[in-house]
Every structure is written in structure tokens, then in C-alpha cells.
């Protein structure tokens, strides 16, 4: 009976996790539709909600869209988004990509020194992005 209870709890957990993922994916699609119809404020709000949901896949996509479409002007908010996503990513390669984006964002917008420090860390680590970081540091 204990094993049956465990299986039921595990099944419930997986179903709940899948439902949450589906809701976030629907929200991501909705944000994209708002963006396509040029309703930037509604799309930004939905992308922020996705980031705060802490879904590793969709939060990263939402941040990428916010950065690419320049939906958020407040750099402190953008840095907060980076912090949230840094805490939920557990693969080194994804974390390196996020750090590269953060470095480029900082160099472009607010804090060149910190951006270059992040690039130096990527260069000095065993990152697959080492050559890209070196190339940017040369310029």
C-alpha cells in the first residue's frame, strides 16, 4: 500500500507539473500574439509573469524576447530578471549563454566594467563560449 500511495503522489505531482508547463506555454504564445499586434505593454507584462514563474525553458525565452524587442527600459529590472533565471538554470552551457547575454547587455546599457568582468570569467573558465568571449574582449 505504501508503494501504491507513492505512485499516486508521484503521478499527481507529474500531472500538476505538466499543467503548469502548459499554462506557461499558453501564456508565452499569448505574449507573442500581443507583441505581433504591437501591444507592447501587455506582452511585456506576460513575459514578466513567465520569468517570475521560474520555468527554466520559458523564462529564458521570455527574457530573450524582452531583450531583443527592447520591451523593458529599466536596467535594474532586467538585471533582476537575469538573477531569477540564473537561480533556476542548472546546466553549465545554458548558464554560460545567459552570462554572455548578461555581459553584452551590461556593456551596451549600463555597466561596461562588470560586463567585461563576466566575459573574462567566461574566457578563463572551461566554457564552450570561451572563444566568443575572447573575441569580444579583443575589441
Which residues does each PLM region occupy?
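Single-pass alpha-helical transmembrane signal-anchor segments
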Residues: 1-17
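Soluble extracytoplasmic domains of inner/organellar membrane proteins
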Residues: 54-59, 63-64, 70-139
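Short extracytoplasmic
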Residues: 26-61
Amino acid at each position: 500500500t505504501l508503494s501504491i500511495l507513492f505512485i499516486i503522489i508521484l503521478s499527481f505531482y507529474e500531472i500538476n507539473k505538466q499543467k503548469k508547463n502548459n499554462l506557461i506555454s499558453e501564456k508565452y504564445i499569448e505574449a507573442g500574439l500581443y507583441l505581433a499586434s504591437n501591444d507592447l505593454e501587455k506582452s511585456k507584462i506576460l513575459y514578466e509573469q513567465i520569468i517570475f514563474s521560474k520555468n527554466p525553458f520559458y523564462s529564458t525565452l521570455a527574457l530573450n524576447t524582452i531583450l531583443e524587442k527592447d520591451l523593458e527600459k529599466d536596467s535594474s529590472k532586467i538585471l533582476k530578471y537575469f538573477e531569477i533565471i540564473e537561480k533556476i538554470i542548472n546546466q553549465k552551457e545554458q548558464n554560460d549563454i545567459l552570462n554572455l547575454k548578461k555581459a553584452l547587455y551590461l556593456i551596451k546599457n549600463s555597466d561596461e566594467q562588470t560586463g567585461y568582468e563576466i566575459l573574462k570569467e567566461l574566457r578563463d573558465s572551461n566554457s564552450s563560449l570561451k572563444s566568443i568571449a575572447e573575441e569580444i574582449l579583443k575589441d
